[in-house]
């Protein structure tokens, strides 16, 4: 009876979180628009809907994931504004539920899981409201991080297999921040495998990665996308933009430290807890428990 009531409570929380996260993004998605950014994927999603292909029929620097997903929403709901915002609201609801699931698996009290997930839903997609590559890339990357954390916690190979798919969707939404997250998780996976003295999990990761790459190549072939077009538009051309921005970076104390001081302050309690655990147990750094906070710091 107790387990049944807990299960019903979980279902109620999940349903409430999805509805709230969906509605709040719908609200902010209809508050206003940016002349260029807001309509970018409305146009591209419609172009995919009528048969045009990214890279082949139109220049795509930001990544095709958002365009293809948006075309699905347009197909079922019609090419209208509500269908456009439904897309980002659905992603907001999906990542909110995943957040709740992850927190619950780390044995946080269910009321706290609900509260933190609720706060997450307010900060995840509503700042944009409408579908945008930065948010898709960040949130798909977050799902990849969630899968990695659950893999470390549960030792379930399924989560290890999911990581490349989420990170792949993130990369094909936008190259950054997905690339940074990919390297951080690869480092964490390498450290974990070294500590466990096994490459079994790396093998699962690589198998899943190869499957994802194979599916992407097949999809690109069926869509008639030339690899040279993809390489020029999505890999080489963005590097020219990145090079220009990198040369304009302000490598001063204010530019590197002071400007991000509140982000760095968040690391202080995390680093302190790890230091304290290392003092209490000299075996802490020799185990695998510290990999989770290490990944969080690297992110």
Q: Model segments located where?
A:
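Extracytoplasmic catalytic/substrate-binding loops of multi-pass membrane glycan-assembly enzymes
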Residues: 28-44, 54-72, 79-82, 223-227
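Transmembrane-helix signature of polytopic, membrane-embedded enzymes
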Residues: 94-122
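Specific aromatic-rich, kink-prone transmembrane helix
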Residues: 98-101, 137-154, 159-167, 186-190
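Membrane-interface transmembrane helices that cradle and orient dolichyl/undecaprenyl
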Residues: 104-107, 144-160, 170, 195-196, ...
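Short acidic/glycine- and proline-prone juxtamembrane loop motifs at membrane-interface regions
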Residues: 127-137
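Membrane-interface alpha helices of multi-pass inner-membrane proteins
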Residues: 158-177, 181-186, 294-299
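Perimembrane helix-loop-helix junctions
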Residues: 167, 180-213, 277-279
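Membrane-lumen/periplasm interface segments of specific transmembrane helices
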Residues: 202-245, 256-262, 269
């Amino acid at each position: 009876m107790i387990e049944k009531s807990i299960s019903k409570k979980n279902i109620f929380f999940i349903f409430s979180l999805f509805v709230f996260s969906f509605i709040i993004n719908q609200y902010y998605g209809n508050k206003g628009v940016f002349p260029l950014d807001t309509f970018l994927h409305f146009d591209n999603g419609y172009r995919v809907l009528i048969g045009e292909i990214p890279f082949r029929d139109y220049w795509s620097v930001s990544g095709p994931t958002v365009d293809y997903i948006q075309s699905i929403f347009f197909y079922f709901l019609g090419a209208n504004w509500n269908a456009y915002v439904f897309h980002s609201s659905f992603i907001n609801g999906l990542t909110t539920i995943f957040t709740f699931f992850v927190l619950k698996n780390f044995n946080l009290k269910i009321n706290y899981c609900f509260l933190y997930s609720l706060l997450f839903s307010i900060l995840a997609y509503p700042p944009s409201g409408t579908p945008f590559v930065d948010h898709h890339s960040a949130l798909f990357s977050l799902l990849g991080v969630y899968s990695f954390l659950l893999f470390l916690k549960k030792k379930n190979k399924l989560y290890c297999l999911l990581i490349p798919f989420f990170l792949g969707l993130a990369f094909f939404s936008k190259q950054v921040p997905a690339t940074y997250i990919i390297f951080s998780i690869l480092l964490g996976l390498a450290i974990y495998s070294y500590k466990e003295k096994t490459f079994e999990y790396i093998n699962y990761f690589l198998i899943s990665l190869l499957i994802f790459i194979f599916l992407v190549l097949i999809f690109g072939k069926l869509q008639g996308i030339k690899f040279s077009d993809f390489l020029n538009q999505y890999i080489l051309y963005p590097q020219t933009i990145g090079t220009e921005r990198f040369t304009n970076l302000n490598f001063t104390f204010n530019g590197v430290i002071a400007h991000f001081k509140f982000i760095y302050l968040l690391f202080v309690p995390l680093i302190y807890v790890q230091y304290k655990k290392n003092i209490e147990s000299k075996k802490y750094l020799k185990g695998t428990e510290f990999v989770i906070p290490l990944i969080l710091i690297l992110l």
